[in-house]
Structures are given as structure tokens and as C-alpha cells.
Amino acid sequence: MRLKGGVVMKKRNRILSLLLAGVMALGLTACGASNAGAAADETGSAAVSTESASSDTAASGEKIINVGVTNTIGSINPLLLNGGEINKYATGLMFLPLMELDADLNFEGMLADSITTEDNKNFIVHIDDAATWSDGTPVTADDVVYTALRLASPVIGNTAMMYYVFEGVGDDGFVEEGAESIDGIQKVDDKTVQFTTKEEMPITTFENSYARYLLTLPKHVIEQYSEEELSTADWFNHPDVVSGPFIVTDFDVDHYISYEANKDYWKGAPKIDKLNIKIVDGSQLYAGLQSGEIDITQQTMSDIPQEDYESVEALDNVDVVYGSPVTNQSVFIQTKNVPDVKVRQAMLYAIDRQQILEELLNGHGEIVDGFLSSASPFYDDSLTPVSYDPEKAKALLEEAGWDGSQTIRFYVNSGDSTFVNAASIIAAEWAAVGIKAEIQTVDFATLMSVAGTEDYDVLAVQYTYAPVDPYPDVAWLLGGEGSWTGYSDDTLNDALTKSQLTSDPEETKELFSVVDKKVQEDVPMFSAYVISAQGAVSKRITGAAPSVYGFFNDVQNWDVVE
């Protein structure tokens, strides 16, 4: 899906808004560290109050599970949803998405039971016939269409949903103010909705970028509110009609969210009575798991510090699960400022990435070149990562006429202690071959501000590329002028374009292999390592397992056995 002409920057900016939301709030541990650090100063009193409440109710015989996370939650209003997984998961416990990925990266029906297309432009969404609201009213196509219309409202102004892809929506992602319908999102019958896109897209892109993020609202309840009121209506703070397994009872978006079971959940009443999401600093997760105040953590929402991994593994009361490698410690090179490909190649050859993985992450991860890891079905395992070869690096620098006078400005997130250490190793290895680097350690907000300029040479951030749908991220990051790399290539662009015109997994794999090989060759970015993050679950819990995707899909089956 190529973006052309005057629309390009509008669409790029829309993509960037979603990507930044994802980088800042998704399970990216860089963000988790910075957010958690900010929240930690205030966490104490809130944590005490929710813990004491949990103890009282547990004593009365209620079953309660506490989930520990390190990312703050912006809002629980589905119309204000950003690209972050914690935001989506916390809200999706009440308002189901149409589809969700499961632990094996298959799309699983949540509110919908099928999504089909014959032409990659018209997507037919069928709502599960059994789906009902907690007040007994059936979930219908009217609810889905109404929610989509409001998500595209310029009055509400959600900047993350990228609805510009649908017919009838402007290139800014919004409909006209006061619009009563969207041409590209139409009711077919009571349980069927047709979504029509302006250009072809693979069904996986539709499912991953749109079906997973459309959290349907009950039209019959909230149509009483004007568009202006929907952003601030108090109803969203304590909704009384939901489609999901839980209903929020209390929350502080910086500290906790408390839920009670929806006993009328149409997929089956939850086995537990209450669920709490506790937002804590990463350094508090080990103590919480040890004491039993936290029952479960998830690999991307719960940033257990690397230095605590062995301690968590040693706990007798929890089982540890390492997630699939999805969080890519990406290092972006601004090619405008480092234009010689041989210099960029030398920068990669000079780094002993395997040693960094073993020493700083205890081997919990992998080394890849490009964007895709072994977690993706499109990963090409025949692509051998560039090996550590400082002599090759020196030779390339000599061929490039590198005189060592330029100092590489290397921006790093101060909240990611592991990569702060890795950056020091990288800078030393660069120095050993004749590349001077000055590490600029800044907070995450500053890092993102710098990323929006070209005033850097190298910038590192943890980034999760959706394994089943990497296109939006890759297309932006290699989008030429204005992107984090400033890099563009015709062969690569052609492969990306073709990836949007096929639904054949093998062809898609071949096309993304072209992309990763070109990235390996030209080095506009490189992966320092890909993290297999740690999750843990109390042995008193059944039916629950930490997983990168699908964590809450069957939360109604979670149970307490003690």
C-alpha cells in the first residue's frame, strides 16, 4: 500500500501517531521502564490501599487475582484507545475486540466469529450469534457501526486509529463533523458488517490493525450522549453494560484498576470474583510475586528487570514462562547524517551482539538482522546475522576514507538500564575500530522528541514489530525523509508494496526476506538483540499462563485453587 503525493505526509503522520503510541504504551519495556519510574514515586499509598482491600475480600472467601504491570493506563474509554496493549487489554476486559491474537499468533474470534474477504478490499465481519450485552440485549451490527463512526469523529479526535484507510473517511482519519454514516463501514444485517478499504490490504493487516482495536460499545446505552460528551462522560468510568468478562469498580490510571466478574458473560461467568491490575515499578515485581501480593505478570506489560530474573526463577511459589522473542532492541541510524553505507556496515561488524546477549540478558533472546524475529511466521531463518568482525569493520572504514573526526551522537533511553549498559559496550567496541561515539542518555519523552528530528546520528529504542503484520512499522521506519532512518530503497519499497497485495504466507515471507536482506546490506538500522521477556504465575492459579499475545482471551477460565 504505497502512499503518494500530497497525502503521503498526512498518512505518514497518522501512522507515526499510532507507532509512537505503540512505542510509548505497548509492551515495549523501554516505555515500561520510563513510565514505571515516573509512577513509582506515587505507587506506595495506592498499592497499600488496593492490597488491604484484596486481603479483606479474600478473607471473606472471594477469589481474587492480582496482575502486576509496569505501564500506566491512559484511559478505559474505548473511544480514546491508543495503540498500547495495556490500554487495549484493560479496556477489552469490559468491551471485547472483534478478534484477538492467541498465544500461537492465530486470530481468535472474540466478539466476532469470522472475518472473510474475497478481494482484500471488502471485509465481512460476522458477530457471534451468541454475543450479548450484560443487560441481555444482543450485540448487533448497529453497535459495531456506531462505534466505528465515533472512532472516526473529528470531535472526539482519536489520533491513533488510522481509519483513513476506509471509504468515506478523510485522509486525516476523520469523517465530516456531524456525519451519520461511513460509506466504507456498513451494516449488512443484524449480525454482519462490511468494511471497505480504499486500497487492497491483506486480511491479517485488517485483523491486526483494526479488528483487534475496535472495542464495540452498546449503542442503545451511550447514544444518549452527544459527540462532545463521549470523551468525558462519567459512564465510561463505571459502565453498567459490557460485553466482556469483567466490569470496572474502581481505578486510578496511574496505580490500579479493580474489576468484578460479569456473572452474565455470554462466554461463561468468570470463575473468580474479582481481578485487579496493579501498576508498580518494575523493581517491585519480584517482591510482589514473592509475597503473593502479585499473582501473575505478562512478558510485555510487566517489565521485570533483567537483574531479577534469576531471583524470580528461584521462587517456589511461581512458575516462570519466557515469552517468544518479540521486543526488538532496535538501533536506528539517521542516514542523512551517516550517509556512507560502508561506515554503517562497519558499525555493525564492530559489535559483538552475541556477547551482549549472553552477558546482559543471560541468553534470553536472539540475534537477528532486520526487523523480524523467529516469533514471526514471515521470519527467514536462512538469513544469517552479521557476525562480530572488528578487522572487517576497520577495513570498511578504510575503504570509506573514514578519518575518525566525526563523533557519532548516540541517543539512548535512560529508563532501559540493560541497554544503557549495552550502549557503553557498543561505544567501546566502536572506539576499538576508530569510531568515536558520544552517548546521550535521555528520558523516554526526550528520546521520542529527538526521534522526530534529524538531529541525531544513532537512536536506540525497544520496539515490538507485530509478528503477523510488520508492514506498518517497517514502511514508516524505512520511509525516506522524515522517518527515523531517512532511508528509502526501490527494491525494498517494491517488496513492501507487494506484501500488501498478497494473502499467501509463503509469498509474504519471501517479500519480508527481501526487506531484511536489504536492511542487512545497507544498515539503516540494526537489531542489537531481541528479548525473550520473563513472565511468572502463582502456583495457586489455574487456567492462566503468561503469554505475549492472547493473555486475557480466556480469562473467564482463570481460577484460584488454594
Please state what every model-predicted region is:
Residues 140-147, 190-196, 244-245, 273-274, ...:
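Alpha-helical secondary-structure segments
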Residues 253, 398-465, 505, 533:
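Ligand/substrate-recognition segments at binding pockets and active sites
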